[in-house]
A protein has these predicted regions:
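Ordered, amphipathic secondary-structure segments that act as subunit-interaction surfaces
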Residues: 80, 85-98
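Helix-start/capping segments and mature chain N-termini
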Residues: 3-85, 104-214
Length: 214
């Protein structure tokens, strides 16, 4: 018969288990340096949304930070779907990251293979009719915002400030220029025009942004 589905799934370098039971080595460079990249999307009825676009961005992030891809693209697609299909709920949040290997703390690149971490968990679809309350904050992030790195401290702090103000999201700005939000791009439709920040080192090349433009 069919294998029993799981409540959620974690994956690390070939091992699968419940997220709560998974462990990661202390010497994984994500621990010391946040030395890795990630991407994330949703599975709806076990179909991963815009997967090719997310994989394009993931492999580009690896390239920009000189992190060897943890596995070939087609193999990663297969592994992501393997994770999605192990979970009972067909609607899931799907997250994966590559880190620059494992080794004693040293800033220079280690001579070890990169690591791959994946997890998927149930995620109900959001009510798109809800209105969002926004806070604003000066954008003090560094000039690697086009890379989806594990270094998210500014977004963590911005999200906490938004919560404290009873808001849903924080809009970053550099002076008079709006860049993006703590965990989303900003797109405005005004007077029939679609307005969003140009793609450069100050914003992430968002997949939803790309699909809105297309």
């Amino acid at each position: 018969g069919e294998l029993t589905k799981m409540e959620n799934i974690g994956y690390y370098n070939g091992k699968f288990d419940l997220i709560e039971k998974m462990t990661v080595p202390m010497n994984d460079r994500a621990m010391y340096f946040g030395d890795g990249v990630y991407d994330a999307t949703y599975s709806v009825n076990r179909t991963i949304f815009a997967l090719e676009d997310h994989l394009d961005r993931f492999y580009n992030s690896c390239r920009l930070l000189e992190i060897p891809a943890p596995m070939p693209r087609e193999e990663l697609k297969k592994t992501l779907y393997e994770c999605v299909n192990k979970v009972d709920d067909p609607n899931q949040f799907v997250y994966w990251e590559a880190t620059r290997g494992t080794g004693i703390r040293n800033h220079v690149f280690p001579d070890t293979p990169s690591n791959l971490l994946i997890y998927t968990r149930p995620c109900p679809m959001k009510d798109l009719s809800l209105r969002y309350k926004l806070a604003t904050m000066e954008d003090k992030r560094f000039y690697y915002c086009n890379v989806k790195t594990l270094n998210l401290i500014p977004s963590v702090l911005a999200s906490q400030r938004a919560l404290e103000k009873g808001c849903d999201e924080t809009v970053f700005h550099r002076g008079d220029l709006v860049t993006e939000c703590a965990h989303s791009n900003v797109s405005i439709i005004k007077d029939g025009k679609f307005i969003t920040h140009q793609l450069d080192c100050l914003v992430l090349p968002g997949i939803t942004r790309k699909h809105l433009i297309e």
